[in-house]
């Protein structure tokens, strides 16, 4: 075999190794975490998810920290609770519900919520919690209340 053939064979082995299935640890060895819900806010919604506990710890922190930070202010939490309970709302209604005196304050908080995909603006300019986020957000609020000792 020539040097050229040796190099081709070596490259083929490397490609095969890269394309082969890597050893994947058992995703449930550390256990499973899950949540579910069925609610009637703005129509019937149902959601269920189960995910490996170890996998949860391996997900990148950036996106989840953005969501937690967006909810980490009392005004933003009030906006989210109001939107879940009442559906899509125009900015003036949100400002009133959150007890804000200026639209500048409201838009400051909405910017954080929209950037984290917790809230979206619909085609009419109103704001809403995306239907796919309603139950996960309710679970987060419930879990935070549990950690804070409010449910016991």
Feature names for model-found ranges:
Residues 3-13, 17-55, 62, 138-152:
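Amphipathic alpha-helical dimerization/coiled-coil segments
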Residues 69-70, 74, 90, 124-145:
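Short, cationic-aromatic polyanion-contact patches
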Residues 73, 88, 100-103:
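Alpha-helix boundary/capping and short turn/kink residues
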Residues 79, 88-97:
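Short acidic, hydrophobic short linear motifs in intrinsically disordered regions
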Residues 100-114:
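Short amphipathic alpha-helical interaction segments
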Residues 114-124:
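A short, conserved structural fragment
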